[in-house]
Design a protein with these regions (language model features):
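Basic, often amphipathic N-terminal segments
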Residues: 1-54
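Generic hydrophobic/aromatic pocket-lining and core-packing "Φ" positions
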Residues: 16, 46, 70-71, 131, ...
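A C-terminal functional module that forms or caps the active site or interfaces directly
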Residues: 170-191, 205
Length: 231
């Protein structure tokens, strides 16, 4: 069974429809992100696209900022998931888990690639401990991503496999792999890292916000044929 797939950076109606038609499990929308990135949507524009997520797919708003701003945006848009990707602290993350759970909105939080950022957000640079802290806070998933606020607009950044494994081996909650995933390397990543979810943005687009059906088909085909490690 292949990992679940999250396609992020959706900006167009036709690309949301493509993802739903191809049975992508999670559709991601970068919305009111706190630093300039080419995929950023206004809350109003995201609100126009979210109702198009159907056929079993779930929606995810990727954002950052203060607890109050994120909470208000989530309650307004009502996605299935909110992904905290703007350097939010563990305390803010835990508060948002509690704030949003009654509305059925679950939280995904990044474990940043830099040790300095992990110390700032979690009080420790140890990636396994960061994962355990997030699990205790009640997040749906920890996202190990090559991107953070400092390089959010950079294309092709690749995740550190050792960082991903340190988090995955420390927790029972879902751990998502993001950063540099494309059809050419996803089989190797699945075989070596065994991610529960792959998070892909630039790996299926011809330019920012323009997804390619051919690239998505190639990614899905590679995922289906990948050999995951035995249980």
């Amino acid at each position: 069974m292949r990992p679940l797939l999250k396609i992020c950076g959706l900006m167009r109606e036709e690309d949301v429809a493509l993802c739903c038609r191809e049975r992508v499990e999670i559709c991601g929308f970068v919305t009111e992100y706190p630093v300039p990135v080419p995929w950023n949507l206004t809350g109003d524009r995201c609100g126009e696209l979210l109702p198009l997520v159907k056929d079993g797919a779930r929606s995810c708003v990727v954002t950052g900022g203060t607890r109050e701003k994120i909470r208000a945006l989530a309650l307004r848009l009502q996605p299935d998931f909110v992904q905290l990707h703007g350097g939010e602290s563990l305390a803010v993350t835990a508060d948002l888990v509690q704030d949003l759970a009654p509305r059925g909105i679950r939280v995904i939080k990044t474990v940043p690639p830099s040790a300095e950022a992990r110390r700032r957000e979690f009080g420790t640079a140890d990636p396994g401990e960061c994962g355990r802290l997030l699990e205790r806070a009640g997040v749906y998933a920890a996202l190990v991503d090559a991107r953070g606020p400092d390089n959010a607009a950079k294309a092709g950044a690749r995740v550190d496999p050792s960082l991903f494994l340190a988090v995955r081996e420390a927790v029972r909650c879902t751990v998502i792999l993001g950063g540099g995933v494309r059809s050419e390397n996803c089989a190797q990543l699945i075989a070596s890292l065994d991610p529960a979810v792959l998070d892909v943005m630039t790996g299926v687009e011809t330019k920012p916000g323009i997804k390619s059906e051919a690239m998505l088909d190639a990614l899905l085909a590679a995922m289906e044929t990948a050999h995951r490690p035995p249980d």
